[in-house]
Amino acid sequence: MDNKKEFKIFCDESNHLSYKDNLTLCSKVMVLGALKVPSSEVIKINKTIKYLKHKYKYNKEIKWTKLNISQKYFYDELLEFFFSSVHMWFQAILIPDKKNLRHDVYNQGSHDLFYYKMYYQVLRNLIEIDTSIKIYLDYKDTRS
């Protein structure tokens, strides 16, 4: 019987597309993040998030880029839940200015190659020897 600890890693990104000068299309900041959770805790964590959404009548997708003051207490309690949990580990990479990236020099001219290299950097610190890991990547929109 295999006694490895089982974890799920949920990944998401913000503003991952190549930088464009038209600021309505793309921000210059990019973030790639991952949340590691023991498989045995996923249902409990989901229930807590659903409870908070119901409590604060928050029916939309949770998006940090769409915050407004009327949602302050929901996000305060959500952050408190995440940061007080001993069952969640978060790792992220922030690229402060995509205009400074040199894909021609470091990534064979490919923004996509850079994207996957950065995800490797995020994930490598969350994966341990002798554990079973399932990684869930967000759908990668290539057009927005």
Language model segments and positions:
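Phosphate-ester processing/binding pockets and catalytic centers
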Residues: 1-144
